[in-house]
Amino acid sequence: MTSLQQELKKKKPFDMPEQEALLNLLRTADQLQIRFARLFRRFGLTPQQYNILRILRGEGKPLPILEIASRMITVVPGITGLIDRLEAAGLVNRKRCENDRRVVYVCISERAVDLLGEIDEPLMDMHKALLGHLDPHELGTLSQLLERAREPLVAEPAEV
């Protein structure tokens, strides 16, 4: 196992442990995102488009655009554009709320549900390939540490 310092060919040690941990987190996230993007591209999706479809399938009913945006894994400034592209591909439909015409609901199509069904197994395989070397206790600890690391960020939402 190589350290981040070796991986980055950094001559001097990191200035402080927080810096090393944060750079480790960013490096790991980047490597994971590359692999997930490659998988979703095989199915004609971006990770953000997949995330929207996953949210809609999980909810089981249409959701307002702002509700979808609040549930995204990554902050997305152009969610309307993402939904436009999903609609053009026949993966979602929009419906205006009858009680409040300003609210637009997004519905997942059967075609999208079928597409997600095709993605499910390769995605689970990828989860196992990327983190299967960690035992359940280590995975739990990792999740807890990441949640703790996010705590100061929850009170201060990210701006795009």
Task: Identify the residue ranges that each predicted region occupies.
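C-terminal regulatory/oligomerization modules of transcriptional regulators
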Residues: 1-14, 137-160
